[in-house]
Amino acid sequence: MNISKNEQRVLHVLAQGGRILYERAPNGRVTEVTCYTREGLILANCKLDVFNKLRRKRLVESKSSRPYQISEKGRRSVRAQLDNR
């Protein structure tokens, strides 16, 4: 599966324990997303178009109206990368 660089960054943050909070319009559509790392920092690469691509590919999921997290398919798709800490 082809995953863009921005999608890969977001998936990597989610795989480390991050989450995506979202705002819905009255019609039920997601209008705004904010991606948080496990430390509570905001990831700037996580825009609405990147989120929609990840959701369309079923790489992120939300259960019981909770924040979006990485799905099992997303965990298998994300490429390993070094974490410079």
From Swiss-Prot:
Region named Disordered: 62-85
**Which InterPro entries does its entry note?**
YjhX_toxin
Looking up Pfam families in the UniProt record yields: YjhX_toxin
Q: From what superkingdom does this record's organism come?
A: Bacteria
Q: Which family does it belong to?
A: Belongs to the UPF0386 family.
NCBIfam families for this protein: PRK13687.1
Q: What is this protein called?
A: UPF0386 protein TM1040_0419
Source species: Ruegeria sp. (strain TM1040) (Silicibacter sp.)
